[in-house]
């Protein structure tokens, strides 16, 4: 395993305190989501999960090392409720899953100092827990604690289809990066469904989640169009080929629930897994651990790989930390018997 090395930081003197006029004065404590943009800018979603109101906010940092310091953000905006999930729509659109039950689309202005609301639609009857943009970039999928999945036309600002195929709360949806009509969903009914919206019966059940533990997170392999990975409430991560009946590989990675999974942009991609055990694990193609960080002091909620530096992985959590991890640029060979212990 690799030891953690802190990334080079931009000297504080080189940064300029310049809070945009419409940005909130203070970021909520719980960081729920993080996404790098193609140019290396970092988007954060924050929530306040205490008190009488569940507030939330969105923040853009052109310098990711300055996050989560509000004074160094490029743009920020208060949301009506907590942010459960978010994702980029192109380079300027931001799709948000809200604790209010709304799916929200926000957009950066031309100067990227304002985040402007494009729509806020209350089509779900409970917290929207997850959103994902289909590979076309014009449609998206949302999943909610109301057991429903909805397919959206973002340009028309409307729901195209609504499905109630799960008999429990939907915990994750993941659009295929390879096919614009295909996505995955999982829920608290202990099922993983493979969807193809072109079919008369669009959902088919994957027979890989019969462990008795609820699936909590999903992601597609970036290069193999029939392969995906899921994590469960027990901390197990499993690799699945949709063309075969069961799991190809499984590994108990965490001691608590898996909260997020994301593949790296490497030619042989790493898999980052984050968890309620407050740790980050990075796995190779065989789900063997190559890196572990326990730097967070509360639930780790999301991870995102830098598009500019493939060795840089950023995590956020409920401890209000944005932590940058440096990894090897490519997977390492298996260690020999004389390798020094960490």
Curated annotation (Swiss-Prot):
Keywords assigned: Cytoplasm, Nucleus, Phosphoprotein, Repeat, WD repeat
Pfam family membership, one: WD40
The WD repeat ranges on this chain: 22-75, 78-116, 123-162, 165-205, 209-250, 253-293, 295-330
Location of the protein in the cell: Nucleus; Cytoplasm
Stored SMART domains: WD40
An example Gene Ontology molecular-function term: methyl-CpG binding
GO biological process: one example: oocyte axis specification
Protein name (record): Methylosome protein WDR77
Nucleotide-binding recorded as keyword: no
Residue positions where Phosphothreonine is found in the record: 5
Gene this chain is encoded by: WDR77
Stored InterPro entries: Methylosome_Comp_WDR77, WD40/YVTN_repeat-like_dom_sf, WD40_repeat_CS, WD40_repeat_dom_sf, WD40_rpt
GO CC, alphabetical: cytoplasm; cytosol; methylosome; nucleus
Subunit description: Component of the methylosome complex composed of PRMT5, WDR77 and CLNS1A. Found in a complex composed of PRMT5, WDR77 and RIOK1. RIOK1 and CLNS1A bound directly to PRMT5 at the same binding site, in a mutually exclusive manner, which allows the recruitment of distinct methylation substrates, such as nucleolin/NCL and Sm proteins, respectively. Found in a complex with the component of the methylosome, PRMT5, CLNS1A, WDR77, PRMT1 and ERH. Directly interacts with PRMT5, as well as with several Sm proteins, including SNRPB and SNRPD2 and, more weakly, SNRPD3 and SNRPE.
Residue stretches spanning the membrane: none
Its biological purpose: Non-catalytic component of the methylosome complex, composed of PRMT5, WDR77 and CLNS1A, which modifies specific arginines to dimethylarginines in several spliceosomal Sm proteins and histones. This modification targets Sm proteins to the survival of motor neurons (SMN) complex for assembly into small nuclear ribonucleoprotein core particles. Might play a role in transcription regulation.
């Amino acid at each position: 395993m690799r030891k953690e090395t802190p990334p080079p930081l931009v000297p504080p003197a080189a940064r300029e305190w310049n809070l945009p006029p419409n940005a909130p004065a203070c970021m909520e404590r719980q960081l729920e989501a993080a996404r790098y943009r193609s140019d290396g800018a970092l988007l954060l979603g924050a929530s306040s999960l205490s008190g009488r109101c569940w507030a939330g906010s969105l923040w853009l940092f052109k310098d990711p090392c300055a996050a989560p310091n509000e004074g160094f953000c490029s743009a920020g905006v208060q949301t009506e409720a907590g942010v459960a999930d978010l994702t980029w729509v192109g380079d300027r659109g931001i799709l948000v899953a809200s604790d209010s039950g709304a799916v929200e689309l926000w957009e950066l202005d031309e100067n990227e100092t304002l985040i402007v609301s494009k729509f806020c639609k209350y089509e779900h009857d409970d917290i929207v827990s997850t959103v994902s943009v289909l590979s076309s970039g014009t449609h998206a999928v949302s999943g909610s604690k109301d057991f429903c999945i909805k397919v959206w036309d973002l340009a028309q600002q409307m729901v195209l289809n609504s499905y109630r195929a799960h008999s429990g709360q939907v915990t994750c949806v993941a659009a295929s990066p390879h096919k614009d009509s295909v996505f995955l969903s999982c829920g608290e009914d202990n099922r993983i469904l493979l969807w193809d919206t072109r079919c008369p019966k669009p959902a088919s059940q994957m027979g890989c989640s019969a462990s008795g533990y609820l699936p909590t997170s999903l992601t597609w392999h970036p290069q193999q169009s029939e392969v995906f990975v899921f994590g469960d409430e027990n901390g197990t991560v499993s690799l699945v080929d949709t063309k075969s009946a069961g799991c190809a590989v499984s590994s108990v990675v965490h001691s608590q629930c898996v909260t997020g999974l994301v593949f790296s942009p490497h030619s042989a991609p790493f898999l980052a897994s984050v968890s309620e055990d407050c740790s980050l694990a990075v796995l190779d193609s065989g789900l063997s651990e190559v890196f572990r960080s326990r730097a967070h002091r509360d639930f780790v909620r999301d991870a995102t790989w830098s598009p500019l530096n493939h060795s840089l992985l950023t995590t956020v959590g409920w401890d209000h930390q944005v932590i940058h991890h440096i990894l090897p640029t490519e997977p390492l060979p298996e260690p020999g018997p004389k390798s020094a212990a960490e």
